[in-house]
Structures are given as C-alpha cells and as structure tokens.
Amino acid sequence: SDFDAWVVNEQKNADTGLTEGSLAYEGQQVYLNAGCTQCHVIGGVWDVQGERIAPNLTHFANRNVFAGAALKNNSENLTKWLANPAELKPGTFMPNLELTEREIEALIEYLGTLK
C-alpha cells in the first residue's frame, strides 16, 4: 500500500549524493555550519550535536507543512521562516541564525532534496 511504502521510505537515511559545487551542496554546508545541527538531525548526514529538541529533517521535502503545521511547505514560507522565525510564529524555539539571502536560498535548495 501507499502507506507501507511511505513507512519504508521514512525509515531510510537522507540521500547524500549531492554534486559538490551545486546550490544544494552549498545548502548542506550551511546546514552543517550555521548551527542547525545543534537541534536538528538529518539521518545519514549528521546527528544532532545538542539536545534533540527540533524536528527531524531527514525527509523534509515530503512534508506539506512545517513549523508545527503552521506553515505550508513552499519556498516563499521557508524564505520568511529562515530569515526570521519568530516573525511568523511568535514564541518559537527556532532562533534567527542571521543567514544571508544566498545562505537561505542554498538551504532551501538542500531541504528540497530531502525526500
């Protein structure tokens, strides 16, 4: 069934076959170096370095919503969220990481590969 296939996929690690120099690869580097790993995990890429208090992002691109189901998963909402999470969801634990526009663009491209 579709559900069984979904369960099998959700148990797999993220695809790590990114082309070095691609925007998605650049986004993975942002993920690894901007502080995301303090709270988030992506299976097969990097385990959480701090407390596992944030959502697992392994299959983020398959989700219809994010931010506690408050926002539709699209590039417009992700751009706003990554620029200033508290503006979209006051009281969120997600910090403003002061990412540049390029870093946000790359991170969104990377998150889009996580299926």
Would you name each region that the model predicts?
Residues 55, 73-77:
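A general alpha-helical scaffold signature found inside nucleotide-binding enzyme cores
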Residues 22, 33, 70-73, 94-101:
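Flexible gly/pro/ser-rich segments immediately N-terminal to CXXCH heme-c attachment motifs
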Residues 2-13, 76-115:
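C-terminal capping alpha-helices of c-type cytochrome domains
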Residues 18, 42-43, 72, 93, ...:
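Residue-level detector of alpha-helical recognition elements and their boundaries
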Residues 15, 28-59, 63-68, 83-90, ...:
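Periplasmic/extracellular electron-transfer cofactor-ligation site
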Residues 2-32:
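Electrostatic cytochrome c docking/interface patches
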